[in-house]
Amino acid sequence: MNMQKMLQQAKALQSKMEKKIKEFEQEEFEFVYQKSITIQIKGNYEIIKMDINKELIDPEDKTMLEEMISEAINEAISAITEEKEKITKGAMPF
């Protein structure tokens, strides 16, 4: 296989991967944390919507709610990152 053909294949693969990533970044995902917090988030980590069960809202325990929101967002981001890695690793020939 000559070098020019290899470069063309690499460019085609890169272009295909970039397209998949752009599509993924516009996809919307929904995550539910402990059946209490629902997060809608795009593949580019943009949070679209968050719904918090009203039973969690306790003016006397603001810290607990803040911690749960942080944990829910972090879990959603981790899941998106894992899915994105599957796309990028799946496109690599080695």
Curated annotation (Swiss-Prot):
Keyword Lipid metabolism assigned: no
Gene Ontology cellular component annotations, sorted alphabetically: bacterial nucleoid; cytoplasm
Primary location class: cytoplasm
A Pfam family annotated for this UniProt entry: YbaB_DNA_bd
Claim: Protein biosynthesis is one of the keywords in the record: no
Keywords: Cytoplasm, DNA-binding
GO molecular function, one term: DNA binding
Compartment(s): Cytoplasm, Nucleoid
InterPro entries: YbaB-like_sf, YbaB/EbfC
Known partners and oligomeric status: Homodimer.
HAMAP family (UniProt xref): DNA_YbaB_EbfC
Protein family according to the UniProt entry: Belongs to the YbaB/EbfC family.
Function, as annotated: Binds to DNA and alters its conformation. May be involved in regulation of gene expression, nucleoid organization and DNA protection.
NCBIfam families on file: DNA_YbaB_EbfC (TIGR00103)
Identification of the protein by name: Nucleoid-associated protein MYPE8070
